[in-house]
């Protein structure tokens, strides 16, 4: 049985999500789907000029997973450019839903993806953790278990 795919952390969303070669009508063109996390991987590596380890850390994936994501992204972009295909940026397995938690036992403050991660302190393993609600994403999820 395969492990579930971890959400990739994404900080940037483009205003434009569809690119077509000049002079070709949309209705007569093949398109390639570039995942949101693939665009993020290229942005971190090629525009922000971070090294692989820094990119992987920002996206909260392993270095190998980051390399797989960016390899896939670059192949798609090069294929679209050389074969005159459109690029649609959509889909993927990503999140921006991060929330800061604080452990009541050891007072460690850390971020979690509340769609995926369990609310257990990564430092001491305690389940006595609370959302500080400052991120604003999880107001409905926390339901009063907050610290101010």
Curated annotation (Swiss-Prot):
Cross-referenced SUPFAM superfamilies: Sigma3 and sigma4 domains of RNA polymerase sigma factors (SSF88659)
Stored InterPro entries: RNA_pol_sigma_r3/r4-like, UPF0251
PANTHER family: PTHR37478, UPF0251 PROTEIN TK0562 (PTHR37478:SF2)
Family statement: Belongs to the UPF0251 family.
Protein name, UniProt field: UPF0251 protein Cbei_2962
Source organism (scientific name): Clostridium beijerinckii (strain ATCC 51743 / NCIMB 8052)
């Amino acid at each position: 049985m395969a492990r579930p795919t971890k959400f990739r952390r994404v900080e940037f969303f483009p205003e434009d999500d569809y690119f077509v070669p000049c002079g070709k009508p949309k209705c007569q063109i093949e398109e390639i789907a570039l995942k949101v996390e693939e665009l993020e991987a290229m942005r971190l590596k090629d525009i922000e000029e971070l090294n692989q380890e820094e990119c992987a850390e920002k996206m909260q994936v392993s270095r190998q997973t980051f390399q797989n994501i960016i390899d896939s992204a670059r192949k798609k972009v090069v294929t679209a450019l050389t074969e005159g295909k459109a690029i649609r940026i959509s889909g993927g397995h990503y999140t921006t839903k991060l929330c800061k938690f604080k452990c009541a036992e050891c007072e460690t403050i850390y971020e979690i993806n509340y769609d995926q991660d369990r609310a257990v302190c990564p430092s001491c393993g305690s389940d006595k953790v609370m959302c500080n609600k400052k991120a604003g994403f999880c107001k409905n999820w926390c339901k009063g278990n907050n610290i101010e």
